[in-house]
Amino acid sequence: MKRILAVDDSTMNLKLVENMIKGEYQLELLGSGFDALAYLENNTVDLVLLDLLMPEMDGMETYDRLRELENGKNVPVIFLTADTDIESEITCLKKGASDFVRKPFMPEVMRNRIRRVLELDELTHYLERKVMEKTAQIEKMTFETIATISSMLEARDSYTKGHSVRVAEYSVMLAERAGWREQAILNLQHIALLHDIGKVGIPDHVLNKPGKLTEEEFAIIKSHTIIGADILKEIKSIPEIEAGARYHHERYNGTGYPCGLAAEEIPAVARIIGIADAFDAMNSKRIYRDSLSSEVIRKELVNGKGTQFDPYFLDIFLQLFDEGKLRRRKESE
């Protein structure tokens, strides 16, 4: 049964409301705005019937303070008043009230207004749930598509298989610990998954060369940042996805590539991915070496603080490292 809170300083008006709708709804009757706010601190209702003209705290003030409460911020409100001033009605509706009913109440009109507002609120919640479900489905599909593209690219080199997925995982952990908002973290995850997409344009004989690269070959490898940014530049739905590909090899002291950006000039997503990328590279076996030990990896990360890596983000990453949150790769991975 739907719960309705009726607030009016007139006992007679509250009795009229009770007689009109009793049996259809669970009803709570209160005589002041103060009582209503105290009640909503610990209780939820489906609708508030709120008298406009009350002593001490009128309906307008009660409404404003009600919207500040967790249990009152979204509840529909119908204002009740004997006031014939049209401006009052306009003001109430502009504030977000669901309806405005004048006294004396017509029982059938009152019941229909209440029914209509509750049905509309129920429909609104239903549509919100559907939108959330569809959004979650789209986000899941987006992640799976991006992860598949990433895996296809890394299939060219068994030594980097799963690299982008792990970089995304570490980046998300860092951003969560840093207090980033949910949508920003989701964007970062997608950006990290595609940060190395530019390697699709690097020849296999350079990408998978077991020995030391020549100066010319290293220049070709470095071009993956530009190639990746060019591939991703038309994606507008994920902010900074181009920046993640272009700038993840920049260094905090300005000696990185491709643009030699320094400190805050480097987008935050790229600074985070840069740390996660370097960690995974050290934590993974390569064609020319085994994975490094935890002690060596930590030492290398610390040595890069303020030169290669953003000090703030690195400190957070080291916390995760020391807590054992960053998994060691198995040889079979």
Residues covered by each model-derived region:
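Metal-dependent catalytic cores of enzymes that make or break cyclic nucleotides
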Residues: A147-E333
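Two-component/phosphorelay signaling modules centered on CheY-like receiver
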Residues: K2, T11-L29
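Receiver (REC) domain active-site loop signature in two-component systems and cognate sites
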Residues: M54, T62, L66, C92
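C-terminal output helix
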Residues: V101-I114
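Helix N-cap/capping motif at the beta->alpha junctions
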Residues: L29-A38, G59-E61
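Active-site beta3 strand of CheY-like receiver
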Residues: N43-L50
